[in-house]
C-alpha cells in the first residue's frame, strides 16, 4: 500500500516516471494533466475555460482540480495505491489533499521531487510532440521517432499549442512561486525525497525505485 506524490516543474518527466512506477508497483496514476486534457477533449464548458488558462501558462483553479481528484480518492479500488502526478501544485491543494485522504482513511507515504533546471525544461517542452495515432511522446532534442516506425510517421505527428518556450518559462516561474512551498510542507512532515531530474530516464527511475523499495521493505 502506497500513496505517493511526484513533484517537478512542467517538462521534468513526471509523466514518464509515473508510467514506470505504476507498472512496477501496481499503482493508479492520478494525473491532473490527463484529467484536464480529457475535459478539453470533451469540449465541455469547463474544458473550454481550462484550455484558455493552460494556453496562457496559468494554472486551473484549486476548487476545480480538488473536485476531480476526490472522484478518484473516493473510489475504493484505488485506496492507498495512488501516485499523484501534477497535484498538489500549491499549499492550499496540499492541505485539501490531506483532508480528503483523512476523510477516506488514507495518507501520503512519500513525496518525490524531480529537480530540473529551466534550460533543460525549455528544451523538453518546446521540443515536445506526439503521435496522433498512439499518443507516444517524442522530443526533437532528445528522442526522435524511428524512421522504421510506420505508426509515428511525420503525417501523424502533432504539437500542442502550449508546448513553446514562452509558455515553458511562464509555467516554470509559476511552478517555482506556487508549488515549491508545498515541498517545504512535505519536508516538515519528513516525507520529501529529492531526485536528480537532469539524469537520463533510466538513471532517474533507478534512483526513484531505490527510494520506494526502502519504504516498502
Question: Where are each of the predicted segments found?
Answer:
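Glycine-rich phosphate-binding loop of ATP-dependent small-molecule kinases
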Residues: 1-217
Amino acid at each position: 500500500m502506497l500513496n505517493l506524490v511526484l513533484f517537478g516543474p512542467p517538462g521534468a518527466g513526471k509523466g514518464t516516471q509515473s508510467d514506470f512506477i505504476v507498472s512496477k508497483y501496481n499503482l493508479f496514476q492520478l494525473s491532473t494533466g490527463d484529467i484536464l486534457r480529457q475535459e478539453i477533449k470533451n469540449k465541455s464548458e469547463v474544458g473550454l475555460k481550462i484550455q484558455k488558462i493552460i494556453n496562457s501558462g496559468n494554472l486551473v483553479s484549486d476548487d476545480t482540480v480538488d473536485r476531480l481528484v476526490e472522484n478518484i480518492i473516493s473510489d475504493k479500488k484505488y485506496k492507498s495505491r495512488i501516485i499523484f502526478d501534477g497535484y498538489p501544485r500549491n499549499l492550499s491543494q496540499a492541505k485539501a489533499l490531506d483532508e480528503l485522504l483523512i476523510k477516506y482513511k488514507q495518507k501520503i507515504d512519500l513525496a518525490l521531487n524531480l529537480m530540473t533546471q529551466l534550460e533543460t525544461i525549455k528544451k523538453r517542452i518546446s521540443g515536445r510532440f506526439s503521435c496522433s495515432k498512439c499518443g507516444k511522446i517524442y522530443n526533437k532534442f532528445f528522442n526522435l521517432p524511428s524512421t522504421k516506425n510506420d505508426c509515428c510517421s511525420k503525417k501523424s505527428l502533432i504539437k500542442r499549442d502550449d508546448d513553446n518556450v514562452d509558455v515553458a518559462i511562464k509555467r516554470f516561474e509559476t511552478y517555482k512561486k506556487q508549488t515549491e512551498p508545498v515541498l517545504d510542507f512535505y519536508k516538515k512532515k519528513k516525507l520529501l525525497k529529492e531526485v536528480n531530474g537532469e539524469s537520463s530516464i533510466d538513471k532517474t527511475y533507478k534512483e526513484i525505485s531505490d527510494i520506494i523499495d526502502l519504504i516498502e521493505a
